[in-house]
Amino acid sequence: MVCALGIEGSANKIGIGIIRDGKVLANVRRTYITPPGEGFLPKETAKHHREAILGLVESSLKEAQLKSSDLDVICYTKGPGMAPPLLVGAIVARTLSLLWNIPLLGVNHCIGHIEMGRLITGAQNPTVLYVSGGNTQVIAYSNKRYRIFGETIDIAVGNCLDRFARIIKLSNDPSPGYNIEQLAKSSNRYIKLPYVVKGMDVSFSGILSYIEDLAEPGKRQNKRKKPQEEEVNNYSQADLCYSLQETIFAMLVEITERAMAHCGSNEVLIVGGVGCNERLQEMMRIMCEERGGKLFATDERYCIDNGLMIAHAGAEMFRSGTRMPFEESYVTQRFRTDEVLVSWRDD
């Protein structure tokens, strides 16, 4: 039996999770929330994490009813992510490892999402759509690696949603994407936006620029038809949110279906913070059912960044014999999903 404590702090959430042989014992989390119209800067985010992390470690052990001596391994997010917040998690993980004399493992953030999704949903060998504020990838397992079949060629889908939420001054509480989703539910008026799919890759930066012009006509100089001439003042924020979701989610469904066909898969697993979006799940479910497949998705406890996913992935690594020398316990802002040898899967 492997009992693991995981620390996740790659972006604006700091989370601690404890798991033992696939059983969830604790999953606590705090979110750094900024005022409407503002994003989160690495330095301020790291400060938030520093102030919260030790209390969360204590809370997780109390919730799990465990002592430090009950743990077999300390796991932390090695990357990808923002360096200052990542360092907070890594430094605390190193300290606990030395203090408690427990092995230490660095975990890939994306691998954590995938393995947590597989554990919670029971998906066996799905095509994975990983959608978050920092990543957009279509992934499938093959020969001891999670292979990336398609991805964004510029910004992530969550970044596109977050930046548009800032443009129209939506609240960041509980998250910009959630508030876009709720606002979109009050409209069914579709405004045609750019649709950019290249094989199994997607692009969101042009869509964001285009819809920014619609939301703030005349703010930027551009060569295309002036927004005022398109009577953009007739568009409500709800119309824009609805249209943005419908467009970018259709793109994600298309590339996921293409990857399913390529891999011969009949399962789709959505992971990452954007995976909580009910409209994305609905569109993906329709596609899966039309193909005779099945959709797997989790709720906000597991799809949003959390320490539990790092604990679970780290426990799987530890169980399969993976060990990490202490001097390799660094962090990296760039850590590709397919760099990791998936030693714990035999299929």
From Swiss-Prot:
Please verify whether the record's keywords include S-adenosyl-L-methionine.
no
Q: Does the keyword Nucleotide-binding apply?
A: no
Positions that bind a divalent metal cation: H109, H113, Y130, D305
The family database entries (PROSITE patterns) matched by this protein are listed as:
GLYCOPROTEASE
Q: What is its main location?
A: cytoplasm
Q: Which GO terms describe its biological process?
A: positive regulation of translational initiation; tRNA threonylcarbamoyladenosine modification
Domain of life, per lineage: Eukaryota
Q: Which cofactor does it need?
A: a divalent metal cation
A Pfam family that the UniProt record links to this protein: TsaD
Q: Which reaction does it catalyse?
A: L-threonylcarbamoyladenylate + adenosine(37) in tRNA = N(6)-L-threonylcarbamoyladenosine(37) in tRNA + AMP + H(+)
User: What EC number(s) does its UniProt record assign?
Assistant: 2.3.1.234
Q: Name one GO cellular component term.
A: nucleus
Give the family, as the similarity comment puts it. Answer: Belongs to the KAE1 / TsaD family.
Question: What HAMAP family does UniProt report for this protein, alphabetically?
Answer: Kae1
Entry function: Component of the EKC/KEOPS complex that is required for the formation of a threonylcarbamoyl group on adenosine at position 37 (t(6)A37) in tRNAs that read codons beginning with adenine. The complex is probably involved in the transfer of the threonylcarbamoyl moiety of threonylcarbamoyl-AMP (TC-AMP) to the N6 group of A37. Likely plays a direct catalytic role in this reaction, but requires other protein(s) of the complex to fulfill this activity.
How is the quaternary structure described? Component of the EKC/KEOPS complex; the whole complex dimerizes.
Under what name is this protein listed? Probable tRNA N6-adenosine threonylcarbamoyltransferase
What organism, scientifically named, is this protein from?
A: Drosophila melanogaster
Name of the gene encoding the protein in the UniProt record = Tcs3
